[in-house]
A protein has these predicted regions:
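Glycine-rich, basic loop-to-helix element that forms the pyrophosphate-binding segment
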Residues: 64-80
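Extreme N-terminal starter segment of soluble prokaryotic enzymes
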Residues: 1-5
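Short aromatic/hydrophobic "clamp" motif used to bind/position activated sugar donors
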Residues: 85
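Donor-binding/catalytic cores of nucleotide-activated saccharide
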Residues: 90-205, 209-226
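Short, acidic, metal-binding catalytic loop of nucleotide-sugar glycosyltransferases
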Residues: 22-31
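A conserved acidic beta->alpha catalytic loop
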Residues: 23, 38-48
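Donor nucleotide-sugar binding loop of glycosyltransferases
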Residues: 13-16, 41
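Short beta-strand/loop segment that forms part of the nucleotide-sugar
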Residues: 31-40, 60-65, 89-90
C-alpha cells in the first residue's frame, strides 16, 4: 500500500502536466502513488500521461470521457490505495518538502486531515501571473471531545481548497465530490462534508502549494450559465456546512 496517493485530474494539460508531476516526484516521501485521470483531453495530454507512466512506475493513468474535474477526482479516489490522499491540479505544483511536512504532521498529531498554507497566482490580461497576497493564519487544531474552535479553525486555515490538504483515506470512504458543482465551490462542499467525518484536523501556516488561477478556469467564468451553476452549488455547500457546524460547534459558537 502506498503512503500517499496524489490525484491529478488532467484536461488539455500537455504544456503544464509534466511540471506538476515532477513537483510531486521530487518530494521526499516513500511509497508515493500518483493517479492521473485524463478527463477526455483533446490535445496531447493522453500521450504525455502514458509517457510519464512508462518513465515512472508510481504513476497510474485512468482515461475517461470528459465529465469534469469532480468526476475525475472521484475516479482517482476510487483507485487510490494510499494511507493518505491529496490532490494536485494539472497546472499547479507542490513546494519542495511539502508532502513530507504534511505527512509528518499527520503522523505526529494523529490527525485525519492536515491543511497547509498556499500561494495563489492569478492570471493578468497580458497572460502573466501575479501573486495575490493573503495573510497566513495561526496554527490550530480541532479534535472531537478535546476542544478547539471550529470557527477559529476555518478562519485561520482560510478558503477550504483540497490541494493544500492531506486526508486520511479511510476517513473519506464513501465521500465523493458533488458532480453538480461544475463552475466552482466543489472544494468547499467536499471539505465541509469531510469535517463531518474526521476526528481531528490540524492547520499549519507553512506554504505547501502553489496554485495558478487561469483566466480560462471554469471557476473564473462570468457567463450566465456559470453564475447559475454557482448558485446551484450553494445549496449542497450550505447543507454540508450546517451539518459540519452541528458536529463541531458548542453553544458558545
Amino acid at each position: 500500500m502506498a503512503k500517499i496517493s496524489v490525484i491529478i485530474p488532467a484536461y488539455n494539460a500537455e504544456t503544464t502536466l509534466r511540471t506538476a508531476v515532477e513537483s510531486i516526484l521530487s518530494q521526499q516521501v516513500p511509497e508515493l502513488e500518483i493517479i492521473i485521470v485524463n478527463d477526455g483531453s483533446t490535445d496531447g495530454t493522453d500521450r504525455l500521461c502514458h509517457a510519464l507512466a512508462s518513465e515512472y512506475p508510481c504513476i497510474h493513468v485512468i482515461t475517461q470521457k470528459n465529465a469534469g474535474i469532480c468526476a475525475a477526482r472521484n475516479r482517482g479516489m476510487e483507485a487510490a490505495s494510499g494511507e493518505y490522499i491529496t490532490f494536485c491540479d494539472d497546472d499547479d505544483l507542490f513546494w519542495q518538502g511539502a508532502l513530507h511536512l504534511l505527512l509528518q504532521t499527520a503522523e505526529d498529531t494523529r490527525a485525519d486531515l492536515v491543511r497547509g498554507g498556499y500561494e495563489l497566482l492569478r492570471q493578468r490580461p497580458d497572460g502573466t501571473f501575479a501573486e495575490q497576497p493573503h495573510p497566513a493564519g495561526s496554527p490550530c487544531t480541532i479534535a472531537l471531545g478535546r476542544g478547539g474552535s471550529y470557527g477559529a479553525f476555518l478562519e485561520n486555515s482560510g478558503p477550504q481548497f483540497v490541494w493544500n490538504a492531506l486526508y486520511r483515506r479511510t476517513a473519506l470512504l464513501g465521500l465523493r465530490f458533488n458532480e453538480r458543482c461544475s463552475y466552482g465551490l466543489e472544494d468547499f462542499v467536499f471539505n465541509a462534508a469531510a469535517y463531518r467525518r474526521v476526528g481531528k484536523a490540524v492547520y499549519i501556516p507553512q506554504v505547501v502549494y502553489r496554485h495558478f488561477e487561469s483566466a480560462q478556469s471554469t471557476s473564473c467564468a462570468h457567463t450566465a450559465q456559470a453564475l447559475l451553476g454557482r448558485i446551484r452549488a450553494l445549496e449542497p455547500w450550505m447543507e454540508a456546512e450546517f451539518h459540519a457546524a452541528q458536529r463541531w460547534c458548542g453553544p458558545e459558537e
